[in-house]
Amino acid sequence: MNVTGLPLPLARAECVRLACSTVPQIFAERVAEVADEVAFRYKENGVFRELTWAAYWQRVRTAASALLSRGLRPGERIAIIADPSAEYLIAQLGAVIIGAIPYGIYPTSAAGEVALLLRKGDARIAFAGDQEHLDKLLDAERLAGARLLEHIVLIDDRTRFVYDDPRLISFSEFEGSGGSQDIQALLNRYIAEVTADNPVGLIFTSGTTGDPKGAFYTHAGMMVGLGYGLLEVMGDLRLRPHRVVTHLPLAHGMGQALSLYVPLFADVVQHLPERGQSLTSLMKEVRPTHFLGVPRIWQKIAAELGVQVQSSGWLRRHMFAWAEQMGHRRAAKLRSVPNAHPCRRFEPLWFATYRLMIWPALYKLGLAHVVGAASGGAPIPSSVIEKWQAWGIPLRNIYGSTEAGMLGSPADIWAEPDAPLVQTFPRSVESGPDGEIMASGGGIFAGYWQDDAATRATFDGKGRVMTGDIAEYTSAGSYRIVDRKKDILITSGAKNIAPAMVESALKASPYVSEAIIFGDGQKYLTALLEVNFDVLAQWARSNDVQYTGFSTLIAHPAVMQLFEQEVQAANHHLARPEQVKHFRLIPKELDPEEGDTTPTRKIKRKHAYAMFKHLVDEMYDTA
């Protein structure tokens, strides 16, 4: 099965077939079609190595055999705590093809959360990416006061000699341990017995308001809701072969969709980094043609580029500003034509300024060859989308949820920053009570693992998933995300405020990494701001602001004046009740490993208030 280049009706017909298929079936079909073509590339010892589809399938079968030899059986779980790697993909799919259930643990998780997820998933075998990840597994067991795992496989085993644990083996030892004839017969039997409605894996929720819950998908649900769903919300990913970089955590649904499942039925070749390699370095080497990132990544790269330009000489600053202005005009023209494809030869002036000023900057970032781009996982400021579109990157926002898969994207490739979203085949999106998004159709999750009460609470009487997201709906059936239902604030003046909209306006500043809005039951809104230290430090050097460390920098009068200006600039785009009256800078960089945020850096609002209650109270005491 290959949907790349197919007309949309034919691609959707293939999607219907996915709903009746299993991962091992689709994998085997892919191998039969393109056995000698590259499945993915991974960097090792400074060199990119290729794995063909035939070799990929063989290594996945080898991993499955090794799991069986260690007693794993269909329906049982394995856990993986690691950064993206070839071994991660192979281990996860090795479990999937025999009907076992893998789940990822974010490498940034604190030891307490690792212990919780090991218990919730009841994993028998765990894979650790390196020494740091292995230490988290062992610390989790110490916190739990019990041995939670039967076997531990260490992917990067350079420090294995430090440990004296009989459960611990290297990945190479693991791969060489399942070759008996009895195991091979068992492997073939279990592959044949997997059905489309068997669980394929768990994806744990972010845990912003409580303990994470393990959402589980069936084989069909995963491939339709997250795999094919990603092609629906990013149609340009389906139109031609693409080169992508693998950087999203594979514990996340979006990361799994792009790295594990989309390549099974679309011409997407992923490129995995060497251990410890930065995303910027990887992009420079790979020069991807499509890039999917969370808002934080798009904002960070844009902010760093902007500060570099502002720190340059007068001539370059003005030339870049002129090129950017031309880019804004061009993007506006493209947005006015449905599904417009840029044709540079008809825009000679823009092309000249683009090649002279913008293209070199994008080339240095590794983004000069990107023809398709999307942001997902959280709201992204409209100004960030506008900036990237002015730079020639057709960035747009996509929407999905852990429980409902990929649900919506703008109708056009070059979309307005706040363009309404249209529902994705084969799901239906409707308005529920209070404007909550209700999702139904193919590709919805099957429930929360061993939590029937939470599962029942997530579905309404019509079998629709209650996403918890509030939206505004148009007469044409499209919708705009407003905020999480649980996060809506009501001021003492009875005004309903969506914090995400205000926070998004504040995070449009290159100096703001995170914003947290308060004001429920109060007369006005206040904000805690996490500074983007790297960008702020560049600004300080350019403006001769002296400091000795983080604390002295954020307390500097010039910095406070800068943030006052940034907040006022954000307020200019907000209605009066939404404007921020007071703010404070968070006196540290938020760290997921210390529990400041979720592992994906989502804000835990109650926890944030508890940590910085004195700052919030101070902003209201000054009234």
Pin down the residues of each PLM region.
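Conserved AMP-binding/adenylate-forming core of the ANL superfamily
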Residues: 19, 39-93, 110-115, 170-175, ...
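AMP-dependent adenylate-forming
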Residues: 26-51, 584-590
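Conserved ATP-binding/catalytic segment of the ANL
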Residues: 428, 432, 436-491
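Conserved AMP-binding A3 loop
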Residues: 50-54, 200-226
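Conserved pre-ATP/AMP-binding loop-to-beta segment of ANL
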Residues: 36-38, 169, 173, 178-204, ...
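Conserved AMP-binding/adenylation subdomain of ANL enzymes
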Residues: 223-243, 250-355, 359, 364, ...
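Structural core segment of the AMP-binding/adenylate-forming
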Residues: 69-70, 93, 97-176, 562
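Conserved C-terminal "lid"/linker of ANL adenylate-forming enzymes
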Residues: 489, 514-517, 560, 564-623
